[in-house]
């Protein structure tokens, strides 16, 4: 008998797939034959650094959510992406951190007082979300109703304190401010409707400690370093998986466009939850679109049900190069000097008073420069607004932006949009969205189910050893506490590589 190396095929060259391959090729030494197959023409998946108007911008993953103990932060440091040489690097998103001051404006141009109106509502929102993430919210259901209950209680307490609570007009501003923060939460979580975001699950979500930062050299540097560390030829681009026959050994992978099939002892599947949702119940992918994978046999019920219950939304970014087209005398508007300091950090409370603003623009919380003084402004969109943004011609997007700016910044200077750049994750057939969330009716248990390898449970082997994991699952939607993040994707890839390492260290033989 001649021992042969177990063959592992990793599907997807995002950070999860590259992490799995890197771990197998590193800790595994020469134990495995590893291949990474990627449907697209690049590595990185939902990590994609680009350039726009002289700035380095992130079209996908943007933040390192906590720097203390974060493997992604460590990877960025090791890749030399955290410190650009002075004069060589491009300016980049949030290079100056979070702004100290923002300009909150109600639709129509009325500046909202930061101390007496905007500040208390922001404190209410932050306090309630902190309580939810500490598991102290109480009850279940969706996050939106939880926040609205809090607003009603706040307004009742203010009214009981005298002065009649500020009247109907102030309550309308309160509602608009809460809606603004709800839009922020939608982009943070990818949920189209916060009524569908499970309140209880918020208590399980965790970030790493420390500040949230962006990567000066670009997020793509992280995945490029992982890919470069793999043996030459490990990553194969342009192979779109169409059928996965996993019922026996070897597992067989069939690709689109007549590419030769591959066989493997183990497959680590790192495709997005959006692609898995598109693949549900379809043994034959004809007519389903380019995204779906035909599983043969179909995925077992526990896996299909977890895929169906979990939420997977879309978040898109709209970058706008802006310019002031009319000069103005320097004037202090609520502590902000637009003419002198450039485009303001604008937070927008929509009240429905200006019909020229299109509905999809009302789904963003803010339009802010990517750093202080920048002529590149950024707006985030989630859900139906994000998806609709992808369908619009550039001219329509610019007109919508102009209508919004004219309403919220009516005083001189008038800000105009010269050109735009936007992401398009909803219609990208390799992803069909951005990241996962725990929907009402789902739970963290479904994230654990997503991570379970197949086949599940003991085989018929007499020694009752666990079955050899033929199909393993990694990606951000398979991590119970860090889902939706790049570090969840990375950690899950390492987890599945470790699962295979442990399987063979446990005494499994592979001979032919």
UniProtKB/Swiss-Prot annotation:
GO biological process, one term: spermine catabolic process
The organism's place on the tree of life at top rank: Eukaryota
Binding-site residues, FAD: 38, 46, 476
Gene3D superfamilies given in the database record: 3.90.660.10, FAD/NAD(P)-binding domain (3.50.50.60)
Induction comment from the UniProt entry of this chain: Induced in roots by exogenous treatment with spermine and thermospermine.
Signal peptide: none
Family matches, as InterPro entries: Amino_oxidase, FAD/NAD-bd_sf, Flavin_monoamine_oxidase
Record note on cofactor: Binds 1 FAD per subunit.
GO molecular function, one term: thermospermine oxidase activity
Pathway(s) per entry: Amine and polyamine degradation; spermine degradation
Spans annotated as Disordered: 448-470
Cell compartment(s), UniProt: Cytoplasm
Cofactor: FAD
UniProt xrefs under PANTHER family: FLAVIN MONOAMINE OXIDASE (PTHR10742), PEROXISOMAL N(1)-ACETYL-SPERMINE_SPERMIDINE OXIDASE (PTHR10742:SF405)
First-tier enzyme category under EC: oxidoreductase
An example Gene Ontology CC term for this record: cytoplasm
Gene coding for it: PAO1
The protein's name in its UniProt record: Polyamine oxidase 1
Protein purpose: Flavoenzyme involved in polyamine back-conversion. Catalyzes the oxidation of the secondary amino group of polyamines, such as spermine and its acetyl derivatives. Substrate preference is thermospermine > spermine > norspermine > N(1)-acetylspermine. No activity detected when putrescine or spermidine are used as substrates. Plays an important role in the regulation of polyamine intracellular concentration.
Pfam family, one: Amino_oxidase
Family: Belongs to the flavin monoamine oxidase family.
pH dependence, entry free text: Optimum pH is 6.0 with thermospermine as substrate. Optimum pH is 8.5 with spermine as substrate.
E.C. code: 1.5.3.-
Catalyzed reactions per annotation: spermine + O2 + H2O = 3-aminopropanal + spermidine + H2O2; N(1)-acetylspermine + O2 + H2O = 3-acetamidopropanal + spermidine + H2O2; norspermine + O2 + H2O = norspermidine + 3-aminopropanal + H2O2; thermospermine + O2 + H2O = 3-aminopropanal + spermidine + H2O2
Keywords: Cytoplasm, FAD, Flavoprotein, Oxidoreductase
Keyword hit for Magnesium: no
Temperature dependence: Optimum temperature is 30 degrees Celsius with thermospermine as substrate. Optimum temperature is 35 degrees Celsius with spermine as substrate.
């Amino acid at each position: 008998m001649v021992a042969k190396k177990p063959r592992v095929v990793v599907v997807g060259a995002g950070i999860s797939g590259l992490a799995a391959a890197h771990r197998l090729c590193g800790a595994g030494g020469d134990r495995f034959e590893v291949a990474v197959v990627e449907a697209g023409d690049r590595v990185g998946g939902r990590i994609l650094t680009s350039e726009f108007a002289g700035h380095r911008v992130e079209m996908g993953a943007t933040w390192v959510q906590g720097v203390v103990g974060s493997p992604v932060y460590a990877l960025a440091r090791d890749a030399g992406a955290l410190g650009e040489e002075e004069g060589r690097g491009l300016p980049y998103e949030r290079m100056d951190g979070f702004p100290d001051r923002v300009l909150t404006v109600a639709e129509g141009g009325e500046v909202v007082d930061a101390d007496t109106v905007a500040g208390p509502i922001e404190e209410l929102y932050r306090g309630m979300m902190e309580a939810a993430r500490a598991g102290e919210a109480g009850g279940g259901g969706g996050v939106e109703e939880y926040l609205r209950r809090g607003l009603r209680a706040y307004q009742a307490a203010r009214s009981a304190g005298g002065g009649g609570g500020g009247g109907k007009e102030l309550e309308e501003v309160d509602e608009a401010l809460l809606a603004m923060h709800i839009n922020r939460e939608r982009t943070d979580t990818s949920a189209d409707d916060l009524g569908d975001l499970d309140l209880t699950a918020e208590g399980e979500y965790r970030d790493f400690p420390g500040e949230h930062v962006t990567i000066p050299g670009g997020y793509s540097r992280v995945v490029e370093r992982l890919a470069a560390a793999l043996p030459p030829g490990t990553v194969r681009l342009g192979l779109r998986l169409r059928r996965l026959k996993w019922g026996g050994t070897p597992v067989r992978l069939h690709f689109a466009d007549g590419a030769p099939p591959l066989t493997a002892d183990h497959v680590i599947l790192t495709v997005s939850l959006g692609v898995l949702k598109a693949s549900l119940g379809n043994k034959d992918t004809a007519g389903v679109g380019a995204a779906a994978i035909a599983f043969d046999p179909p995925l077992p019920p526990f896996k299909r049900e977890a895929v169906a219950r979990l939420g997977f939304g879309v978040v898109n970014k709209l970058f706008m190069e802006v310019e002031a087209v009319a000069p103005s005398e320097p004037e202090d508007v609520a502590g902000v000097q637009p003419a002198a300091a450039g485009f303001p950090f604008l937070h927008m409370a929509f009240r429905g008073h200006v019909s020229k603003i299109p509905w999809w623009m009302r789904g963003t919380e803010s339009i802010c420069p990517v750093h202080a003084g920048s002529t590149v402004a950024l707006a985030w969109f989630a859900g139906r607004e994000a998806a609709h943004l992808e369908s619009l011609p550039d001219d329509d997007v610019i007109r919508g932006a102009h209508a919004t700016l004219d309403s919220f910044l009516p005083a001189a200077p008038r800000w105009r949009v010269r050109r735009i750049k936007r992401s398009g994750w909803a219609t990208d057939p390799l992803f069909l969205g951005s990241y996962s969330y725990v929907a009402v009716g789902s739970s963290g248990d479904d994230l654990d189910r997503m991570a379970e390898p197949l086949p599940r449970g003991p085989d018929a082997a007499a020694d009752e050893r666990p079955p050899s994991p033929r199909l393993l699952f990694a990606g951000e939607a398979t991590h119970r506490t860090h889902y939706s993040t790049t570090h969840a994707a990375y950690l899950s890839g390492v987890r599945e590589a470790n699962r295979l390492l442990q399987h063979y260290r446990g005494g499994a033989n592979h001979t032919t």
